[in-house]
Amino acid sequence: PFMIRSDVVNGVMSFAEMDAMMYKIEGEDLYLIGTSEHSMIGKFKGQLIDEKKLPIAMTSYSPCFRKEVGAHGIEERGLYRVHQFEKQEMVVLCKPEDSEEWYNKMLGYTVEFFRSLDIPVRTLECCSGDLADLKVKSCDVEAWSPRQKKYFEVGSCSILGDAQSRRLGIRAKGKEGNYLVTTLNNTVLATPRGMIAVLENNYQADGSVKIPKALQPYMGGKEIISPKKDK
């Protein structure tokens, strides 16, 4: 769903994050999603899941809507930070002891994706003071920007422990009793920032753009996008 109720919003994020990000539908108990993670996690609200069904791994490509309160400066303009965009998101519900394995696996997917496009990337683990609310561990994936001559964030992978499952009442039924599941999320690709990374790292002096080999089959075999010449 592209809209979720307030009980789901309060279960997946803090009030401060909600106030800065979410668009509320006036006169309705509904909010536009800032990420499909919220819809995917919210569908399990109040459920008792058989432990044998864990892990539950999901992915979604959806529109996202964000107010982006507080964003300012030249590097925050244009495609970098917009109010509506599309994003590929991954979510996992698992046993607490399996969270590190899934964290490393999902983080690897994002790094592998960008490197398949010949884009230089690095990972930057967030210190405790930089962690967003509810997160236990988080790592940003950053791509190189030739224009800015620095790396910029293109993805993020996080473990949220039982913060979301406790608020939403998502439990697993195991041999030794019921317990709260651990949730994780991973942004594989937000299309605006992905487009910036592809364009900047493949831009040529004559104004043309090289198409990464991995994308050429989806571009009819085309290798170069050339600028239109003035008539």
Language-model features and meaning:
Residues P1-K231:
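TRNA-recognition modules of translation machinery and tRNA-sensing kinases, especially anticodon-binding
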